[in-house]
Amino acid sequence: MVYSVGLTGNIASGKSTVAEFFSELGINVIYADKIAKELTSKNTPCYQDIISHFGSSVVLNNGELDRKRIRDIIFSNSNERLWLESLLHPVIREKIEEQLIACTSPYCLIEIPLLFNKHHYPYLQKVLLVIAPLESQLDRIVKRDHCTKKQALAILATQPNLEQRLEAADDVLINESGLSELKAKVNKLHQKYLREAKIKQ
């Protein structure tokens, strides 16, 4: 199987931008969140399980899941979050493996927001952690989710702590300056992963 790097980091740390930069360099990127969205689309087995568990209050008028409502529930109740993770994570891991087999680039990047235990993903060779200053994260969440700073802090409070993240990480990318500096850091890591994957340019 292709050499693979797990990309992770807390919400609003800049993971998606980092993933885009790797993609621009010709690297296949697999998005765990995108897979999760497909797995929970209308009338899928996971969709039915979620409705059976949470009830009709999590369904919009068009029959789709009310993802904001579900997010509010799991951010305020750790048991509900664990239930949802135990439903989705095994299936997500399976789908990631299927996409890895089809990967055509020298190595593959897998964006997994909640990755803090590499053992759950035996096909990962490396874990790349993106971290950003707290204020930057809060600003991004407030702008993206149109929420208050207090709500943004509550969202961040549900994320794995930095110590856990660092323990699982092989490489750490600090996103604290502009995009050009971030791009330069990605370029450096790209060269490193090419070497590690034993691929000559």
Curated annotation (Swiss-Prot):
Matching InterPro entries: Depp_CoAkinase (IPR001977), P-loop_NTPase (IPR027417)
Protein name: Dephospho-CoA kinase
One GO MF term: dephospho-CoA kinase activity
E.C. code: 2.7.1.24
Regions annotated as coiled coil: none
HAMAP family, alphabetized: Dephospho_CoA_kinase
Taxonomic placement: Bacteria, Pseudomonadati, Pseudomonadota, Gammaproteobacteria, Legionellales
A Pfam family the protein falls into: CoaE
Organism: Legionella pneumophila (strain Paris)
Keywords, sorted A to Z: ATP-binding, Coenzyme A biosynthesis, Cytoplasm, Kinase, Nucleotide-binding, Transferase
Family: Belongs to the CoaE family.
Claim: Protein biosynthesis is one of the keywords in the record: no
Catalysed transformations (reactions): 3'-dephospho-CoA + ATP = ADP + CoA + H(+)
Annotated metabolic or biological route of this protein: Cofactor biosynthesis; coenzyme A biosynthesis; CoA from (R)-pantothenate: step 5/5
Transferase listed as a keyword: yes
Localization (cell): Cytoplasm
Function text: Catalyzes the phosphorylation of the 3'-hydroxyl group of dephosphocoenzyme A to form coenzyme A.
GO BP, sorted A to Z: coenzyme A biosynthetic process
Gene name tied to this protein: coaE
Binding, ATP: A12, S13, G14, K15, S16, T17
Cellular component annotations (GO), alphabetically ordered: cytoplasm
Boundaries of every DPCK domain copy: 4-201
Record Gene3D superfamilies: P-loop containing nucleotide triphosphate hydrolases (3.40.50.300)
Listed SUPFAM superfamilies: P-loop containing nucleoside triphosphate hydrolases (SSF52540)
Top-level lineage group: Bacteria
Major subcellular site: cytoplasm
